[in-house]
Amino acid sequence: MSIISEFREFIARGNVIDLAVGVIIGAAFNDIVKALVDNIVMPPIGLVLSGIDFSDLAWVLKPDDPATPALDAVAIQYGAFINTCIRFLIVAWAVFMLVKLVNVIRRREAEKPPEEKPAPTPQETLLMEIRDLLKRRAD
């Protein structure tokens, strides 16, 4: 088997395609959560906290020097980190709720009583009796 045919078989498996779809949806979900945090969640939090915009929070280690415009300020931007942590918590909560929903659905499926087999028809009953008689004669 050539390497190309092995690769084609590997790609054609459902797991690889499912993983690719999951990564693409995850990337799109990341953009949605970023927009949600930056544009909807953080403005009210900043308003409650006296108009603080977390994305602008930083510890400036070395300020801009107007004499050397090529050098930017050096700062630890902990506000961006706070936004990222909030974004992570929202994603983690969404994934938790999704897993919880899937577990509830699986539990409901497991709790359903198994479907009972229908009673044998008279013809099947007769055939089983004949089978049993033949077994007894053989013994």
Swiss-Prot record:
Ranges annotated as spanning the membrane: 16-36, 40-60, 79-99
Subcellular localization: Cell inner membrane
Main location: membrane
Entry keywords, A to Z: Cell inner membrane, Cell membrane, Ion channel, Ion transport, Membrane, Transmembrane, Transmembrane helix, Transport
SUPFAM superfamilies referenced in this protein's UniProt entry, alphabetically: Gated mechanosensitive channel (SSF81330)
Cellular component, GO annotation: plasma membrane
Molecular function GO labels: mechanosensitive monoatomic ion channel activity
Mode of membrane association: Multi-pass membrane protein
Family indicated by similarity: Belongs to the MscL family.
Function comment: Channel that opens in response to stretch forces in the membrane lipid bilayer. May participate in the regulation of osmotic pressure changes within the cell.
Annotated NCBIfam families: mscL, PRK00567.1-4
Quaternary organization: Homopentamer.
Name of the featured protein: Large-conductance mechanosensitive channel
